[in-house]
From Swiss-Prot:
<dbReference type="InterPro" id="IPR036510">
    <property type="entry name" value="Ribosomal_bS20_sf"/>
</dbReference>
<keyword id="KW-0689">Ribosomal protein</keyword>
<keyword id="KW-0699">rRNA-binding</keyword>
<dbReference type="GO" id="GO:0070181">
    <property type="term" value="F:small ribosomal subunit rRNA binding"/>
</dbReference>
<dbReference type="GO" id="GO:0003735">
    <property type="term" value="F:structural constituent of ribosome"/>
</dbReference>
<dbReference type="InterPro" id="IPR002583">
    <property type="entry name" value="Ribosomal_bS20"/>
</dbReference>
<dbReference type="Pfam" id="PF01649">
    <property type="entry name" value="Ribosomal_S20p"/>
</dbReference>
<comment type="similarity">
    <text>Belongs to the bacterial ribosomal protein bS20 family.</text>
</comment>
<dbReference type="GO" id="GO:0006412">
    <property type="term" value="P:translation"/>
</dbReference>
<dbReference type="GO" id="GO:0015935">
    <property type="term" value="C:small ribosomal subunit"/>
</dbReference>
<comment type="function">
    <text>Binds directly to 16S ribosomal RNA.</text>
</comment>
<keyword id="KW-0694">RNA-binding</keyword>
<keyword id="KW-0687">Ribonucleoprotein</keyword>
<protein>
    <recommendedName>
        <fullName>Small ribosomal subunit protein bS20</fullName>
    </recommendedName>
</protein>
Amino acid sequence: MANNKSAKKRIQIAERNRLMNKSYKSTVRTLTKKTLENCEKYKKNPNEDNKNLVKTSLNKAFSLIDKAVKKNVLHKNNGANRKSKINNFVKTTLTTK
């Protein structure tokens, strides 16, 4: 247990940061799943609306991953790997007919 005031404050700060990081990671996972779901939807019914839906969800996911990397929630290599996996899935989905 913390013995002085500054150590107690650091515990509070660490807990606050942990919760914010958890929120960011959760949102990244959610947007990744949404993008993959939209890809599956496009596979079943390939039309312009579904294609635009895939592209917008991809942009949102990339944006949030970049922000998480910028705030040191994710390591830059981890962010790059996540973006690469999503992008490869989307690319194969959009090119396959």
